[in-house]
């Protein structure tokens, strides 16, 4: 894995510091933990880049304080990188079923963009936080992304007179169903998170200001029927732009 051929670290308790020369692999150790936790790098690195250039695979095993063991293996062939996961020796076939088992939080300088960055960056980060505690939310997001991609492709074909408007009916129904459930999950998460956000800020700040983080959904409608109605009313504009202009993919989060 990266520049680490083999490494065993035992009995990590309390606050732990990794020290060493630049380029010695300190961050790579943290990255390996993120792989074991969420099956991807917190650096957003390509899967192939993490495999040593003269190797075809790597293996990571982490045991938590409850003695649960999580094992992740990445193997590369000419087509793609394949991932295998196990918990306590039992193979887990779906990534969505593994994802929320070993919970970790990574914070680095680039995470300041949660405040200074775009709405898309905040939305992506908060989605990842919710997903760590809800495998259902992972499935909803994956479904919605596929539906959104298919709907946008169809919108472009309708604009070019290669498809009929009526073909949107099935996609709009699926879109509205997943959208309402995603928005419900996000609202519930923000209600829970905002309370802890304010209390945590008060403990570290000597200022009297009370900050908040707010969820600003792109659509005020909550149930799938109301969302479907709004989506249908916006069809002409969506077709003209060749893109879905409304939905949870355009939700915003703001720090106040």
Q: Regions from the language model: what does each represent?
A:
Residues 53, 144-147, 186:
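Intracellular alpha-helical coupling/juxtamembrane segments of multi-pass membrane proteins
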Residues 113, 120-169, 173:
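Long, charged N-terminal accessory/stalk domains
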Residues 32-33, 103-106, 172:
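Short hydrophobic/aromatic segments of transmembrane alpha-helices and their interfaces
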Residues 37-121, 125-137, 194-202, 224, ...:
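Nucleotide-state sensing region of NTPase/ATPase domains
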Residues 13, 24, 28, 45, ...:
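Generic alpha-helix structural propensity
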Residues 13-49, 133:
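Phosphate-binding glycine-rich loops of NTP-binding sites
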